[in-house]
Amino acid sequence: ALVWRENGKHLEVLLVHRPRYDDWSIPKGKVDPCESVRTCAVREVAEETGVQVILGQPLSRVRYTIGGGARKEVHYWAARVAPGSSAAVAARAAVKPASTKEIDDVEWLRVGQARKRLTYSYDRDLLGELVDLWEDGKLDTWTLVLVRHGRAVKRSVWDRPKERDKETDEATRPLTH
């Protein structure tokens, strides 16, 4: 995932250095068995950078050849740092940080610096895609949940947790029963 943030009027992205290849790149990795590509993206960013993220806009897929002629396809998303209090983060399994043999440096860089630092042209293309979305105001995303034939539980029959306030109750009341 290409992790981004705004710092004043500037867009910054998070890059990693891999000593084995002596390159600077966007955090990425291999999908574990029975893991979705989205879950993989979130896990790999956490392992390689120590940063928990929430995925946003999908970016292009990149295909290239690795050693032995094998083909590799990488799915990318724009991603923002998740708030520490995020329910999405609380629900995630703990991750083991990447060793310093895999990732030995992580840096937030402004776009111009990142473009110069990135080793591969396909990473620079992804950065350009992210910048275009940012300039068009299309990086901020939100979740929209559609429920067909859903029915809210009546307040009178819902056994709500006692420690929550009414606003939280309404936000967490089951939609179906």
List where the protein language model places each region.
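Short aromatic-enriched loop/helix-cap "lid" or pocket-rim segments at secondary-structure transitions
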Residues: 67-71, 155-160
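Conserved acetyl-CoA binding element of GNAT-fold acetyltransferases
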Residues: 25-29, 165
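Unchanged
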Residues: 29-125
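Short intrinsically disordered, low-complexity coil segments enriched in acidic
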Residues: 1-4, 95-97, 171-175
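Charged phosphate-binding loop/patch that engages nucleotide di/tri-phosphates or the phosphate backbone
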Residues: 121-141
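Loop-to-helix element that buttresses phosphate recognition and phosphoryl-transfer chemistry
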Residues: 158-177
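Short, flexible hinge/linker loops that cap or flank conserved catalytic cores
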Residues: 7, 100, 137-139
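N-terminal strand-loop-strand
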Residues: 1-26, 143-157
